[in-house]
Amino acid sequence: IYTIVYRKKALYPIYIFVLITGLYGGFALWWIPYLYTWTILWGITMLLPKGIKDSHAAMIYPLICGLHGLLYGVLYAPAQALMFGLDFDGMITWIVAGFPFDLLHAGGNLVAGFLVLPLVKVLKKLEHR
C-alpha cells in the first residue's frame, strides 16, 4: 500500500516495521531474512506501472500478495541455508517441508490483497487533503 502511494519513500515504513519486529521478537537468526524479503515485495510493486487501471489493480495486487506468501519460504531459504550450513538439497527439503505453511500464508495474503486497492484510494485521498 505504501509502495503504491509513496514509491521509494515506502522503504522507511518497511524498515521501521522490520526494526520493530526485531525489537518485539528478538534480533535472532530468524530476523535476518526480514532485511530482504520485504524489499523484494517492494521491488516487485515498484515494477508495476503507476497509472494501472483499477480493474487490473483489483486482480494484480491480490495476486502479488498471494505469490509473496507462497514464495516466502523460497525467499527465506537461502539465508537459512547459509546460517545453518544446508547444502542445496537440504535447502530444497526445507522449502518442501514448509510448503503447507506457505500455502496458508498465500491464502491469507491473497484475501488481504483485496484490501490493497480500497486502502490505496483512502490513503491517496488523505494525502491530497
Features from the language model and the residues they span:
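Transmembrane-embedded, aromatic-rich helix segments that form part
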Residues: Y12-Y15, L35, F114-L115
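Transmembrane helix irregularities
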Residues: I4-Y6, Y24, G107
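Membrane-embedded alpha-helical hairpins and interfacial helices in multi-pass inner-membrane proteins
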Residues: A28-P33, L47, D54-R129
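Generic transmembrane alpha-helix motif of multi-pass integral membrane proteins
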Residues: I1-L11, G43-L48
